[in-house]
């Protein structure tokens, strides 16, 4: 004979089954087989057998284990409920969990809910009230929190919880919990998350809200001065209790803490809840002050997750600007103007960006002077003014104070000194100082090691620099590292930049069409953020890659589109290189005279920009045009440019130039 029973139910019902089983075992007449909880691997195996015909994703197995704690009955019933409701279905060769027809998802199967509610109904009123407060507190709780709902004194609640835990009913003991106010009480955890869910959902809405407030009050007193470090927990209870005024500062604190941990997606969730809560408060200066701080925090968070030029970033800073003006907040205005300047910069609106930054400096405050110089370095670099860019970057670094509070970093989430170093690096390459450029790029990375977003930026810029230097293998390595950092932390703009540079480098090192596809995909992702800043540059990389993999004709179409995008009304740092690439492609088609003209245009533009490295590269390629020997004038010009260099003699261009000059 085989029989089953639950020890906790037998104890609750007063049935003698436990004693009977012990006596039978003592006489050797029975064997007890305890069915333990399943681990994550066992749950995955159960799902694999119960869901044939498609793969079971690891995240689905983890979710089921988390919801059921591995209780076999719960696993089977939850799986059955989701499949019966059509919420779990195969798609593209794998099982996917989707919302049901009503837009929600069945958290507790009906049969299982009835079973759990029967167990709850066997409790006396005091135990049930105590467990309801505990359910409001969370999956883990202190007895002191459970006592806040009026279910008795701390000692009485602690004793009741301990009794339930001893009998294996609903709770497990976890050890003592000490709060900063001196309170020490026993800690407990719900045996199963489904128990807590059923308990929580059966509490009437009004009582549930009051319990959340009671729990928040007790936690706030218990945490005392340390309450700020528990801001997210307190905000959750206060929102659930509809106390939006008290929840607001905790949500702001939680968002600020998330940004400090480089968790911008988490910060956005808190800030969206905060902005919603503020709409429920009376209008007035106090509400506007809170919204201003929220929008100023939202700008950098959105920048990190959606890109510099996204409409959401512009909307956050635009609203913050309106509030700064209304509240007369000059300090905050400087931060907001910088954010708007960054948006303009990454949409290639250089004049607007420069005007906003000049306005910041004209305000005569030291606030964000470093950041303003950093963004001016970016703006002037993209306009082809490498010398001005380097000057702004170095003035910014002169303002950098290592001991200053850089909690917010730049208003778009990046360490300003890191940015100054890498703009100095990129400008220096164009100015003909490739080795010093590399030193600045490496300093940027060293400074960024403790801040993931700045680290992703510094690694991307190292990939840029090696691309400029013509070192495809090094560019590929740094692009790979940048992609790993950016993808791991959820920084899409840096991820797509790394993908573009990595695609170019892959095409140049292996002539693999996969590099071109990666480059195209990255470019599409870049444009999807709304950014236009480097669009012509990326098209130049695509043309260069196409020349290696598919031949010159398609590359010519792409590079001519890049030149058209730059137009005639604005300078652009990479325009000399675009004409040089066009010359290379024309030369490969055997059109030597047209190629020479393209090189001449590249040389003219580079000389006008004062960008010595770009001028030397164009002169070098002009000397190597197919079916055409370099003229003495071309060779003399290359010699003149080569002799101006004082460093970088190991870089590919200078090595090739030296070989060509010595060969002649």
Question: Where in this protein do the model-derived segments appear?
Answer:
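Generic long, charged, amphipathic alpha-helical segments
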Residues: 554-612
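Generic helix N-cap/helix-start motif at coil->alpha-helix transitions
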Residues: 226-230, 247-248, 370, 417-420, ...
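Short secondary-structure boundary elements
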Residues: 3, 35-269, 273-282, 546
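Acidic, glycine-rich loop-and-beta core segments that form the ion-binding/anion-interacting portion
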Residues: 444-523
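Sensor-1/coupling segment of RecA-like P-loop NTPase cores
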Residues: 1-33
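Inter-helical turn/loop elements of alpha-helical hairpins
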Residues: 9-10, 172, 198-399, 425-439, ...
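Alpha-helical scaffold segments of alpha-solenoid architecture
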Residues: 488, 495-496, 500-568, 575-576, ...
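Short, flexible, glycine-rich and Lys/Arg-enriched loop motifs at helix boundaries
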Residues: 279-287, 401-416
